[in-house]
Design a protein with these regions (language model features):
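Terminal targeting signals and extreme-terminal segments of soluble enzymes
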Residues: 1-188
Length: 188
């Protein structure tokens, strides 16, 4: 008996047809994953277009990978420093909120939008040059809220900042706003 309580002989005696069916299902899963990857790439493109002229674009924030569960992005230190020549803590917060908000927008889906309602951050070390990378990982993805933990690291992989963001997921696009899930509108 394995750790799930199933008899090994019963499990291993599965007919070949079941294995073929599993292989076909795996192929379908692969195709579905490719479709999800394409949708995420289109979402990143659409968000980049919508972000032109916004604070994240002015700060050089670039999203490199995105799903509702995990978002990765980078930001240059140059241009985002405080008077002592170090990365500004507020810049780390903007990176954290930007990445978490992308994940929350993906969690919300088309026709809905995400707005940050709480952010907290702890700054662990100073950075004077290079690029920082943020990874937002979903802690909670519900119908009305989404929460992310964001780890920001320097070029050497050392933790610079730990942040936590909660977003409210709304049913309608705000007046004058854009639906981040509407990639076609972003291309216009």
């Amino acid at each position: 008996v394995d750790r799930d309580g199933e008899a090994r002989a019963d499990r291993d005696a599965a007919p070949r047809a079941d294995q073929d069916g599993a292989a076909r299902a795996a192929g379908q899963d692969s195709a579905a994953q490719t479709g999800q990857d394409d949708a995420a790439a289109q979402m990143i493109e659409g968000l980049a277009r919508l972000s032109e002229g916004t604070l994240p674009s002015r700060m050089g924030i670039t999203v490199t990978a995105a799903s509702a569960e995990r978002v990765v992005g980078t930001m240059p230190v140059a241009g985002n420093i405080q008077p002592y020549g170090l990365l500004h803590g507020g810049a780390s917060c903007v990176l954290a909120e930007s990445l978490g908000s992308v994940g929350a927008a993906l969690q919300a889906g088309p026709g809905r939008f995400a707005v940050g309602i709480e952010i907290s951050a702890t700054h662990h070390r100073a950075v004077a040059e290079g690029v920082v990378t943020g990874v937002a990982t979903q802690v909670h993805g519900g119908r009305t809220t989404a929460t992310y933990e964001i780890a920001i690291s320097d070029d050497r992989g050392r933790r610079v900042c730990s942040a936590r963001l909660t977003c409210l997921l709304r049913e309608q696009v705000p007046p004058g706003g854009h639906d981040p899930g509407d990639v076609a509108a972003a291309r216009e």
